[in-house]
Swiss-Prot record:
The lineage of its organism: Bacteria, Bacillati, Actinomycetota, Actinomycetes, Mycobacteriales. The keyword Chaperone applies. Its main location: cytoplasm. It comes from the Bacteria. It catalyses: [protein]-peptidylproline (omega=180) = [protein]-peptidylproline (omega=0). It comes from Mycobacterium sp. (strain KMS). GO terms for molecular function: peptidyl-prolyl cis-trans isomerase activity; protein folding chaperone; ribosome binding. Its EC number is 5.2.1.8. Belongs to the FKBP-type PPIase family. Tig subfamily. It is an enzyme of class 5 (isomerase). Involved in protein export. Acts as a chaperone by maintaining the newly synthesized protein in an open conformation. Functions as a peptidyl-prolyl cis-trans isomerase. Residues 424-478 are annotated as: Disordered. Signal peptide: none annotated. Residues 162-243 form the PPIase FKBP-type domain. This is Trigger factor.
Length: 478
């Protein structure tokens, strides 16, 4: 087999392939043997019919089509392997010569990773915000802790923000009842914004037993995106009384004996979260600088595929109704033109980022170990509330393991970039990046650090209230 590569653009090539007919003869032999097992000819046992009779029955052209159809993908892969081409996406294959007894000739046009001139990584200077902790932030954490230990007491007055109410809901669309939007005895914190838009405004000022109608747009179900008239009835109103922030409360809500010790712990908790946020800012700034300093040719078909995927996801929940989608955008103060422009900008940035990270990974010779993949799998399984083995099966079934591998490699790459850069805060102080981006931990250390801060926060919450549960993200994986 012979193959040559033509460069059509910085991001696209045409691979020309010639396969001698002699290389296809074993494929014809196998095809006829399989056919002989399936076709019964008078006077011959199954699998023993002569090839000429089989050709006469099926037709030589039909067999040629079958053999060529089965041979081309493998020959394309062989041609790619023998070249330095790094394909992106699926090729567009055109068979230019296909005759029995003659060489098979075809071309394959495919997007490829472009050649990228990378910046001097040692000259990269990253500046981020310093870590500053205010009394107000610590007080917010303390207030949240007090709220978890608050008690609810019934009140005889109109509802206001912060109250806990029991409500009945019903809705109609175009005068018809919406069964899935009907519920009774639903508990809701007024002002939380956790249910449908407009509900909190409708509840404020209502007394026990009073009802009110309001108009809103349904976000889910078969009527998603449609305007509905919702009726809310307040069944009961309770207010939350908070415990005093004293030593007794500290002993109740934590492992500490005094309120001062508890505040010190909350201060450190805020600091841990801010360290993670600073690490995320460092990572984002590093990527931003790299994108600014690097010219990356974009393969249009890959960009368009990303755009198509985003559009599909956006309108899938609306049964691909373009008119309803346009109405939804208008309600959000946007338009289809603005949506399309933003989608293209985001797709181009995403593709540019992936190509840049892959080029950097090659230059830095970033290797992904089994431990890196295992750590990412464990981290993701904790995030989605699944067992690691269960998540692994989901990823395998959806052919997502290569994408996870690429994502881990890119994470390790940006960590290596950060570790080699000069990193300061806006006050001019050097920032030690080894906690999240160190050479021994790489990108996984950052991920683990962020997760560790979340875990610490959850542990603190567990000492605050036994009734809290956090499983919202599990549904995303399921």
């Amino acid at each position: 087999m012979k193959s040559t590569v033509e460069k059509l653009s910085p991001t696209r090539v045409r691979i020309n392939v010639e396969v001698p007919f002699t290389e296809l003869e074993p494929d014809f032999d196998r095809a006829f043997k399989e056919l002989a097992k399936q076709v019964r000819l008078p006077g011959f046992r199954p699998g023993k019919a002569p090839r000429k009779l089989l050709e006469a029955r099926v037709g030589r052209e039909a067999m040629l089509d079958q053999v060529v159809g089965e041979a081309v993908p493998g020959r394309y892969t062989e041609a790619v392997t023998s070249s330095d081409v790094q394909p992106l996406g699926q090729p567009e294959i055109e068979i230019t010569k296909k005759e029995y007894g003659e060489d098979l000739v075809f071309t394959a046009e495919v997007d490829v990773r472009p050649e990228i001139t990378l910046p001097d990584l040692s000259a990269l200077e990253i500046t981020v915000d310093p870590i500053e902790i205010t009394d107000e932030e610590v007080d917010t954490e303390l207030q949240s802790l007090r709220a978890r230990f608050g008690t609810l007491t019934g009140v005889d007055r109109p509802a206001k923000d912060g109250d806990f109410v029991s409500i009945d809901l019903s809705a109609t669309v175009d005068g018809k009842d919406v069964p899935e939007a009907t519920t009774e005895g639903l508990s809701h914190e007024v002002g939380s914004g956790q249910l449908i838009e407009g509900l909190d405004d409708a509840i404020v000022g209502l007394s026990e037993g009073e009802s009110k109608e309001f108009t809103t747009t349904l976000a889910a179900g078969e009527h998603a995106g449609k305007e509905a008239i919702v009726t809310v009835t307040v069944k009961s109103i309770k207010e939350r009384e908070l415990p005093e922030p004293d030593d007794e409360f500290a002993q109740l809500a934590s492992e500490f004996d005094t309120i001062d010790e508890l505040k010190e712990s909350l201060t450190e908790q805020v600091r841990r979260v801010k360290r993670v946020q600073q690490a995320e800012q460092i990572r984002d700034k590093a990527l931003e600088l790299l994108l600014e300093q690097t010219e990356v040719p974009l393969p249009e078909k890959i960009v368009q595929a990303q755009i198509d995927d985003t559009v599909h996801n956006a309108i899938h929940g609306l049964d691909h109704d373009e008119d309803r989608f346009a109405e939804q955008l208008a309600e959000q103060g946007s338009s289809r033109e603005e949506f399309d422009a933003n989608t293209r900008t985001e797709a181009e940035k995403a593709v540019k980022t992936q190509l840049l990270m892959d080029a950097l990974a090659d230059q830095l010779e970033v290797q992904v170990g089994q431990g890196d993949l295992t750590e990412r799998l464990v981290l993701m399984s904790r995030q989605y509330g699944l067992e690691p083995q269960q998540l692994l099966q989901i990823l395998q079934q959806n052919n997502q393991l290569p994408a996870m591998f690429a994502d881990v490699r890119r994470g390790l790459t940006i960590a290596a970039v950060v570790h080699g850069a000069t990193v300061k805060d806006t006050d001019g102080n050097d920032i030690d990046t080894t906690e999240f981006f160190g050479p021994s931990g790489g990108a996984q250390a950052e991920a683990e650090g962020a997760d560790e801060a979340d875990a610490d926060s959850d542990a603190d919450s567990d000492t605050e209230a036994d009734s809290d549960t956090e499983a919202d993200e599990a549904d995303e994986a399921k």
